Regions:
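C-terminal peripheral helix-coil segments that are non-catalytic and often amphipathic
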Residues: 1-8, 102, 143, 147, ...
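N-terminal intrinsically disordered/low-complexity leader segments
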Residues: 1-16, 79-88
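Generic hydrophobic, amphipathic alpha-helix propensity
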Residues: 17-25, 42, 67, 71, ...
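Short hydrophobic clusters on alpha-helical segments that form packing/core surfaces
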Residues: 21-29, 107, 210
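Conserved hydrophobic residue
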Residues: 34-35, 133, 162
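Hydrophobic alpha-helical connector segments
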Residues: 66, 79-113, 167-174
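Amphipathic alpha-helical packing segments from all-alpha helical-bundle domains
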Residues: 98, 109-118, 122-124, 131-158, ...
Length: 216
């Protein structure tokens, strides 16, 4: 294997420092909020000089936006898992109930992850200052989740397993049955999320209530 040249080594060191800075900044933003986090703190926690931070990022706003966009971009793997569940072959009402339960449970688990809750809390707190970033977060997270559910409901409706006149509304209702109370509680009471058995109970109840309204 060829040894890395000076240019490649320099790029590697730069990438490492950039990662150190973004990791430290994310932890500080989540813990202290945007306004109470300084570039001095970020540099100290990252183990780099303040000049290095400013060499990578023009200002705190730029750093915050890049971090938030990067974190929301990591939602792809969760959506891939939800899509795989939603695309499970369904031919009977019982199949549909089981699939909805699995979809509800994975959806709940994803949103109840502490980093997800912390970032959502932070984005909401800074939405007035960063409206475009808040919009991006919504589009990449909650909206894509609703799009996925709506697509699955449409397919099941076409199979004759559901009768929902407004699929977007039905998707929103399913999402709230799954997330509503638990998410509200977790956002206001940090660290308090449903235990596994309770999550299973919520998922089953959400599927049952949804099918009671729209199942054929």
């Amino acid at each position: 294997m060829d040894e890395l040249g000076p240019a490649e080594l320099a790029r590697g060191r730069t990438a490492l420092k950039r990662r150190q800075i973004t990791d430290a900044a994310l932890a500080l933003f989540l813990r202290n909020g945007y306004d109470k986090t300084s570039m001095d703190q970020i540099a100290a926690d990252a183990g780099v000089s303040k000049q290095t931070v400013y060499k990578q990022f023009a200002d705190k706003e730029t750093l915050f936006e890049e971090i938030a966009r990067g974190v929301t971009g990591k939602s792809d793997h969760i959506l891939d898992e939800l899509t795989a569940i939603a695309q499970t072959p369904v031919s009977t009402g019982d199949d549909l109930r089981k699939t909805l339960q699995r979809l509800a449970r994975r959806y709940l688990d994803a949103v109840m992850e502490q980093p997800v809750l912390s970032l959502r809390r932070l984005i909401i707190a800074e939405a007035d200052q960063f409206p475009e970033l808040a919009s991006h977060y919504y589009q990449q997270g909650p909206q894509r989740g609703l799009d996925l559910i709506e697509s699955a409901l449409r397919r099941w409706s076409e199979q004759g397993l559901l009768a929902a006149p407004d699929l977007r509304l039905a998707a929103s209702q399913f999402a709230y049955l799954v997330l509503g109370s638990s998410q509200d509680h977790a956002l206001f009471q940090s660290g308090q999320t449903p235990r596994p058995a309770e999550r299973t109970r919520i998922a089953k109840a959400a599927a049952s209530m949804f099918l009671a309204a729209y199942g054929r």
